[in-house]
Amino acid sequence: MISYLKGIVAGIQNVGSNRVILTLEVNGMGYDLQIPQRLAKQLPTTGDLVQIFTHYQVREEIPLLYGFSSPAERDLFRHLLSVSGVGAASAIALLDTLELPDLVQAIIAANVQILIQAPGVGKKIADRICLELKAKLIEWRKSAGFFVATEGPAPGILEEVQMTLFALGYTAHEVSHALHVVSEDIGLPKDAYVEDWIKQAIAHLSSSEQVSH
């Protein structure tokens, strides 16, 4: 089994609307790997040396390679594939929608509303992911070297805050980051009013938009 490949970035191309293919030159051979869009944005320009952690799969007798930025990201991809009804496209969509710790936290907390923000992931699949992976990920996160963050609104408040922000057009990644900032930097209590969480999160998101412009 191929654990990782270390080689030169020969090219990155978008195939269709949601597939990104990295061509990696290793010892004179070119390997095509499907990678998350998030990884594609992190990779250096063509010609630079990189290390990509891989998952090998044979589908309909066609060998496929998937590439990831870390062993933890690859292992979580494999956990997602173990869930009935979850294919590579859905697993990569989840990895692209949320940062690794946020995705693990959402699954362990059975936060279906944030999981269904990933393209192609419906409520039924999200429920199944939470049901089948919660116990596994509680153990796995320890060996992976990180713990699920405890900041953010209390569970009873979180879903209402998230749904309000999603309705305003913010992405799952933007919402998770904003709630982290509001909790860690501003110090808003977990049991503060829903309106306070929403107000502070929007203030942060609005200021971030102004900076980006």
Swiss-Prot record:
Region of interest: Domain II: 70-148
Entry-linked Gene3D superfamilies: 5' to 3' exonuclease, C-terminal subdomain, Nucleic acid-binding proteins
Subcellular location: Cytoplasm
InterPro entries, A to Z: DNA_helicase_Holl-junc_RuvA_I (IPR013849), NA-bd_OB-fold (IPR012340), RuvA (IPR000085), RuvA_2-like (IPR010994), RuvA_C (IPR011114), RuvA_C_sf (IPR036267)
GO cellular component terms, semicolon-separated: cytoplasm; Holliday junction helicase complex; Holliday junction resolvase complex
Segments for region (Domain I): 1-69
Keyword list, A-Z: Cytoplasm, DNA damage, DNA recombination, DNA repair, DNA-binding
The keyword Cytoplasm belongs to this UniProt entry's keyword annotation: yes
Disulphide-bridged cysteine pairs: none
Role: The RuvA-RuvB-RuvC complex processes Holliday junction (HJ) DNA during genetic recombination and DNA repair, while the RuvA-RuvB complex plays an important role in the rescue of blocked DNA replication forks via replication fork reversal (RFR). RuvA specifically binds to HJ cruciform DNA, conferring on it an open structure. The RuvB hexamer acts as an ATP-dependent pump, pulling dsDNA into and through the RuvAB complex. HJ branch migration allows RuvC to scan DNA until it finds its consensus sequence, where it cleaves and resolves the cruciform DNA.
UniProt similarity note: Belongs to the RuvA family.
Quaternary structure, from the entry: Homotetramer. Forms an RuvA(8)-RuvB(12)-Holliday junction (HJ) complex. HJ DNA is sandwiched between 2 RuvA tetramers; dsDNA enters through RuvA and exits via RuvB. An RuvB hexamer assembles on each DNA strand where it exits the tetramer. Each RuvB hexamer is contacted by two RuvA subunits (via domain III) on 2 adjacent RuvB subunits; this complex drives branch migration. In the full resolvosome a probable DNA-RuvA(4)-RuvB(12)-RuvC(2) complex forms which resolves the HJ.
Name the record gives this protein: Holliday junction branch migration complex subunit RuvA
Organism listed in the record: Trichormus variabilis (strain ATCC 29413 / PCC 7937) (Anabaena variabilis)
Species classification: Bacteria, Bacillati, Cyanobacteriota, Cyanophyceae, Nostocales
Primary gene name: ruvA
